[in-house]
Curated annotation (Swiss-Prot):
Keywords attached to this entry: Methylation, Ribonucleoprotein, Ribosomal protein, RNA-binding, rRNA-binding, tRNA-binding
InterPro entries for this protein: NA-bd_OB-fold, Ribosomal_uS12, Ribosomal_uS12_bac
Stated role: With S4 and S5 plays an important role in translational accuracy.
Gene Ontology MF, one: rRNA binding
Modified residues (3-methylthioaspartic acid): D89
Protein name, UniProt field: Small ribosomal subunit protein uS12
Domain of life where this protein originates: Bacteria
Lineage start: Bacteria, Pseudomonadati, Pseudomonadota, Betaproteobacteria, Burkholderiales
Encoding gene per record: rpsL
Region named Disordered: 1-26, 103-126
Subunit structure: Part of the 30S ribosomal subunit. Contacts proteins S8 and S17. May interact with IF1 in the 30S initiation complex.
Amino acid sequence: MPTINQLVRKGRASETTKSKSPALQDCPQRRGVCTRVYTTTPKKPNSALRKVAKVRLTNGFEVISYIGGEGHNLQEHSVVLIRGGRVKDLPGVRYHMVRGSLDTQGVKDRKQARSKYGAKRAKAGK
């Protein structure tokens, strides 16, 4: 326990929190270009082929980003928007693709949670 005099001289050291998405550099999203689009397998006990892309961001960072939703149109040199948010069963994947912006199309025939997948509202007649 420090004395009052020690606190006057030094003060309390504030704990610095480590960012969970350092490549964004405190921005909500970042633009980038896909350098590789591929599938990878999750950790045990899950089993699937998860769609991911390696993206070079405008600030020079190269990150792995998850492509959510069913089906996508991304390939090498696609310009994409990245947001934070990790995928628990994919080690090293700390970012998500924003669907429906830039070169990334929204998910087709999506009825629920449309805003998360960049899907427009379906016509009432159909």
